[in-house]
Amino acid sequence: MHYLDEHLLPGQFGRFFIVVSLIASLVATFAYFKSVQSKNDIDGGYWKKLARYAFITESFSVFAIFGLLFYIISNHLFEYKYAWQHSSRSLEPKYLLACFWEGQEGSFLLWSVWHCVLGLILMKAAKKWEAPVMTVISFAQFCLATMIVGIYLFGEKIGSNPFVLMRESGFLDTTPIAHVGMDVSAPIRQDYMRLPFMQDGNDLNVLLQNYWMVIHPPVLFFGFASTIVPFAFAFAGLWKKNFGEWTKMALPWALLSAAVLGVGIMMGAAWAYESLSFGGYWAWDPVENASLVPWLILIAGIHTLLIYKHTGHSLRTTHLFFILSFGFVLYSTFLTRTGILGDTSVHAFTGEGKSLFYHLQLFMGLALIPAFILFFRNYKDIPSIKQEESGSSREFWMFIGSLVFFLSAIVIIGKTSLPVLNKIMSSLSGILPFKFLNRAVAPPEDQEFAYNQIQIFVAIIIAVLTGLTQYLKYKNTSSKFFWKQILVPTILSVAAATLVLAFGDINYYHPRGGYGFLAAIWLGIACSLYAVIANAAYIWIGMKGKLRLSGGSIAHVGFGLVLLGILLSSSKKEILSYNTSGISIPFDASSKEKTGENLTLVKGVKNDMGRYWVTYENDEQHPQKKEKWFFNIHFQRKDGKEEFMLRPSAYIKVKGNEGIQPEPDSRHYMDHDVFVYLTALPAPEKNKDTASFSPRTVAVGDTIFYTNGFMIIDKVVANPSDERYHFTRSDTALAADITVFSKQGTRYHLRPVFYVKDNQAGYILDTALSQNLVVAFTQVMLDKKVVLQVKESNSVMKYVTLKAYKFPFINVLWAGIIITALGIFISMAR
């Protein structure tokens, strides 16, 4: 059957190149393997040449697949399920790339693209290590190609093809309108592409419609992909039994991987800070943790590699750390994409990701089991110096620091893997007769504190070690030399810490941790300052000011600033939006929001918020995204020195779902940020006011009844002084002071105003929002009576409920990330 309006050529080319990439990567793997195993240079050279052609072909195919998929998405070819599922016509062009990584297929493709880039460089740069290293990378490419091939083997689906058409996907099978005669057992209509629901796509997840999500995933995936290079070198060393020589070639690659992966992780933190509404940048989310763990182990591996380079110690540990860093990249992929995390993560893929459960387990097994077999088989042959390191040597304390990083990673991944542990125990309970297998391990009630109470001590130890260790020499250090070098930085650090702790008002108190946890926070801040000052001083004391040779010290300065920024911004985070309006908006029991920490702003009414007067001025709808609204919140400092506008936004009833999806906004200063996001809005369809005013002529002391109670006119005040009104001396104004008594016994005070300004009469109404009551003072009668207009409406007026924080010293964190990456890049270049 010929279907109308379909564009089949891009998909046909895409499927062709997927098959080519699958076959070419397998050929490259086999040919590189044969090159390594060849007994003579002639055979080895032949196989290597074939492998290169195959890998170049595979790379071209992957780039072509990427380009074709982008063509389909950008041209809104909704006959393809991937384009329909992840994009729409209203999507801004700058977010089209983000459609790639919303789905499984696109993110695996992005990973594969970076492997191609790395492999093409290594074909020239790896020299004699090319064949064994590229065997590993080519095999990884084969595994990734199976993720997008989308074929059935022995009744099991292998991968998910991004070029599947809507009519092939099964999506239309239960849609009667898409079938001939409205019969789902009949063929799909030839003109199904002209049906209304096929004219636009399902749209991109609103959380991904942010500029950070255009740049964060490519950087993060480059970091993930690059961890295969030190892994491949370690694997090659074990395979070729050339245990130490590979380290020199691997070091700059490991540094590159650490820098890019670290920046990618913190870009994710920046995205969370600007796009998510939990009021921060790190929540110990399982997927955040799963990306952090490979980085921690990679950093540990870099330091043990440096120990080996200078002393010959720790080569075995270096092999292990590089194997584990790549292994945990695969494991993090397993956690993210199989749905095993369920609703414990805001990042996790679900749905079709469940089909990858065994597929990714196989990938992990094929990659890691051979590596561990080689490691343990060659363990005794890996060079190891029998003599223990001296306690006064640099390598001893570097190893301790590496071990702390490793143990920190194990603790984090252990807590993160609770859903996996519960699933394993549940599976075993049907096989083994042990009662404890039926007991699921519950996550901690306060997840953030459960991590923080351990990681604060990791931060303290690492901060101290980064400050001290560079002042030690490899192999041995005399105490006289050490104390002479370290004395001045230590005195400066103690002085700085004393000033910060004495005058910095570090008052972070957690009810679970008590004053012991507060003391740990103080100690962590002091040690972070020590790391910054001691490493900055070492650039001049140890390196004589030669920045080109000081990459390690610069990276340590940056890392100290990261720790300091985290501790200061978290311990001094201040809620600004305490409820001063008297309007309480209830939250669901499942919400983490507290009514007293959220301020409700009625449109046009100024409210008190800390050091600011804030006013909800107006709102506007996004020109393309009709479900997205921007809300203009005016801030004015009470001392009159500054005023500014913040524009938090929210998606309202996205795809028919109730509630809102807020996007924060923030005002940046050198020493703090003001951070605002919306927590509640009236539903737009409920905000249409159809009620009308009813006039009441009354005198002071009279009573007016309304549905839920009554109100008494207490007095009429001439020329009232009120912050809400801005009258000049030439204006005339009267305010009616009214007390409202509800049936529930609650009292409210209203003060509507009648005024004459520039010879024009006007009025300012007042509301009792919780009573749906609006009162306007519209006229003064000759007999000392006044006319009040009263209205009861289910939509009194527009309002927003928001939460606002002050994040102090958040820029210390961002600066630390940049400086850390800069230091690592300097070390890599050196």
Regions picked out by a protein language model, each given a short descriptive name:
Residues 1-830:
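Solvent-exposed, non-transmembrane regions of integral membrane proteins
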